[in-house]
């Protein structure tokens, strides 16, 4: 009947069983669920647990006189008979001394230590129960399959189940709530669980019975933990003996997650501004607990890998009356309550269902993985449903949850419509927007109407059928009197002079040279310019296009050089800037740069 513990090389991707080897009447393929602490435990014989309370509440733990938990956080401080002392702790405060930890934890040592606190230093089972890591009561009771016919199961507790009466007699109904919610197979509580209820009342773990507790905390310091009633309507479990020194880090770390009603304004029951959603109190409590479960799944992912189930796995036909009067267990402002598993499945859906039943396909053969116990094992709790029944119930609960969410949306819709209408009535419409256009179309303001839409011409008193021009009598649309007509005026006789005679070349021949140059430079693009240029050509002048000057050969002097392209000699030039003639000697004159005689217009 004595179990043997063998070491295994485990990997992160393919993790075998948690290291518990059983012989004789042990469970076939008994394993922890994926959110258990995968500690390697050896078998504790019957002789090691009879007649002793097993574990004390404070200051070191002794089993059969030997200290099992010491205040040393870096090694094995003492030994528990039946637990092999060869498995030391793997890191700083990351595991319970005397318990071998599977390599799946890896780097989880500091993470568990920071979240849970100094569990090893105080050696207090109450801390490990409430914090959800280390050696917890769910790990001893539910995860280790303590029932009457367990034989040599994970913990050898034949007969009257002395470990239940000895080790777990200092528990409370609050712990039973955790045991029921975190049982791996999710079935109803066995007879030993029911018997343990009477034994759990001797200590009252969460009801502040420990009188010599030097805790620095008080329940008045945490009003959020004591003000909200439990989801099942039972009495509220106080912080109690959770006020241990070892819980100081986890309370300080998690008190910031205190959930208040105003954090979820869209939920029923919230009163803010003009909003008041109507819903019965039972639905409010259910929805609040579902929200807490979602927060736990998001912010406390350590619980799935450290051996503590935050919301409870799916159960097929667990009796509800066994859990309705167990108050919720709170730690640092976040409630690990016995949430209704129907609502939990409806909110978390495939995630919880997959983690609860993912190992049904793995039970046939191959290396056993971390998952659920098989349905045909001898240690399975009675009353568990088949896989098809679980599927059917899950779909039924999911449908109820969707119908409940639809009711919530229909309850909130009339309020949204009313609030939208009230907001639109309070805010003044934009005069330049679509709402402002309505006042223009309705023509409430006459000035604005005439500016935007114009004025009806028939209202101005105009004769639209008249053949004459209307502008003679129409003064203005804002004028009440018609216009007086065109004003009377007379044109002077000088404006009626006769057309001057056309230009004649004979007239230009009579002008002097200065007059001709004046007409040419002062009347550009005029017929007089052409006539003046023609008269200058008649008098022996020629126009240079490049220099824009008039040239003439000196009389009685021939050019020094004369070719078809150019000629060089002495020339007389008229400078319009100085208005005089100048003499240029030895000047080269290109023939192509000379302007030809202009063509006079014919009248």
UniProtKB/Swiss-Prot annotation:
Biased composition (Polar residues): 1-28, 36-70, 312-335
Gene Ontology annotations of biological process type: DNA integration; regulation of DNA-templated transcription
Lineage, top ranks: Eukaryota, Viridiplantae, Streptophyta, Embryophyta, Tracheophyta
Protein keywords: Crown gall tumor, Nucleus, Transcription, Transcription regulation
Assembly behavior: Binds to VIP1. Interacts with Agrobacterium tumefaciens VirE2. Forms a complex made of Agrobacterium VirE2, VIP1, VIP2 and single-stranded DNA (ssDNA).
Predominant localisation class: nucleus
Gene3D superfamilies per record: CCR4-NOT complex subunit 2/3/5, C-terminal domain
UniProt name for this protein: Probable NOT transcription complex subunit VIP2
Domain of life of the organism encoding this protein: Eukaryota
Role this protein plays: Transcriptional regulator required for Agrobacterium-mediated stable genetic transformation by T-DNA integration in host genome, but not for T-DNA transient expression.
Entries under Pfam families matching the protein: NOT2_3_5_C (PF04153)
One term under GO cellular component: CCR4-NOT core complex
Disruption phenotype: Impaired stable genetic transformation by Agrobacterium T-DNA.
Inducing factors: Upon infection with a T-DNA transfer-competent Agrobacterium strain.
Residue numbers spanned by region Disordered: 1-70, 212-242, 306-335, 355-377
UniProt record similarity statement: Belongs to the CNOT2/3/5 family.
Cellular compartment(s): Nucleus
């Amino acid at each position: 009947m004595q179990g043997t513990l063998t070491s295994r090389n485990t990997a992160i991707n393919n993790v075998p069983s948690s290291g518990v080897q059983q012989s004789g009447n042990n469970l076939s393929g008994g394993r922890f669920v994926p959110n258990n602490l995968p500690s390697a435990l050896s078998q504790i014989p019957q002789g090691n647990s009879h007649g002793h309370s097993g574990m004390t509440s404070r200051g070191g733990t002794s089993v059969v006189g030997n200290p099992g938990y010491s205040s040393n956080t870096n090694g094995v401080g003492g030994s528990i008979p039946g637990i092999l002392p060869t498995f030391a702790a793997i890191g700083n405060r990351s595991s319970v001394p005397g318990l071998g930890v599977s390599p799946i934890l890896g780097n989880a040592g500091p993470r568990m230590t920071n979240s849970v606190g100094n569990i090893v230093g105080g050696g207090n089972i109450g801390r490990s129960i409430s914090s959800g890591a280390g050696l917890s009561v769910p790990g001893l009771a539910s995860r280790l399959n303590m029932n009457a016919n367990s034989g040599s199961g994970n913990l050898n507790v034949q007969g009257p189940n002395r470990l239940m009466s000895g080790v777990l007699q200092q528990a409370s109904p609050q712990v039973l709530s955790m045991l029921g919610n975190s049982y791996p197979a999710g079935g109803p509580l066995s007879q030993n669980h029911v018997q343990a209820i009477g034994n759990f009342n001797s200590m009252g773990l969460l009801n502040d019975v420990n009188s010599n507790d030097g805790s620095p905390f008080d329940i008045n310091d945490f009003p959020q933990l004591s003000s909200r009633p439990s989801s099942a309507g039972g009495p509220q479990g106080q912080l109690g003996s959770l006020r241990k020194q070892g819980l100081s880090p986890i309370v300080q770390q998690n008190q910031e997650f205190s959930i208040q009603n105003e954090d979820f304004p869209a939920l029923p029951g919230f009163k803010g501004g003009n909003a008041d959603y109507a819903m019965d109190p039972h639905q409010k409590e259910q929805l609040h607990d579902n929200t807490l479960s979602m927060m736990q799944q998001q912010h406390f992912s350590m619980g799935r890998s450290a051996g503590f189930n935050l919301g409870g796995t799916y159960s097929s036909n667990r009796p509800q009356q066994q859990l309705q009067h167990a108050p919720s267990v709170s730690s640092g402002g976040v409630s690990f309550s016995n949430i209704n598993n129907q609502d939990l499945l409806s909110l978390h859906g495939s995630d919880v269902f997959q983690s609860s039943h993912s190992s049904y396909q793995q039970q046939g053969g191959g290396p056993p993985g971390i998952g659920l116990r098989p349905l045909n094992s001898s240690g399975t709790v009675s009353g568990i449903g088949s896989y098809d029944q679980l599927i059917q119930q899950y779909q039924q609960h999911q449908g109820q949850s969707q119908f409940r969410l639809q009711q919530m949306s229909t309850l909130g819709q009339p309020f949204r419509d009313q609030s939208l209408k009230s907001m639109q009535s309070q805010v003044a419409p934009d005069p330049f927007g679509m709402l402002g256009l309505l006042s223009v179309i309705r023509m409430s303001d006459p000035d604005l109407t005439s500016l935007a839409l114009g004025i009806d011409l028939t209202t101005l008193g105009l004769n639209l059928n008249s053949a004459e021009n209307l502008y003679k009598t129409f003064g203005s649309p804002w004028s009440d009197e018609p216009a007086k007509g065109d004003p009377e005026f007379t044109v002077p006789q000088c404006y009626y002079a006769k057309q001057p005679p056309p230009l004649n070349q004979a007239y230009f021949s009579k002008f002097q040279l200065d007059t001709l140059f004046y007409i040419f430079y002062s009347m550009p693009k005029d017929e007089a310019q052409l006539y003046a240029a023609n008269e200058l050509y008649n008098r022996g002048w020629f126009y240079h296009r490049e220099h824009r000057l008039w040239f003439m050969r000196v009389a009685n002097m021939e050019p020094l050089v004369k070719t078809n392209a150019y000629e060089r000699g002495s020339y007389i030039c008229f400078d319009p800037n100085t208005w005089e003639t100048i003499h240029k000697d030895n000047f080269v004159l290109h023939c192509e740069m000379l302007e030809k005689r202009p063509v006079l217009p014919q009248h």
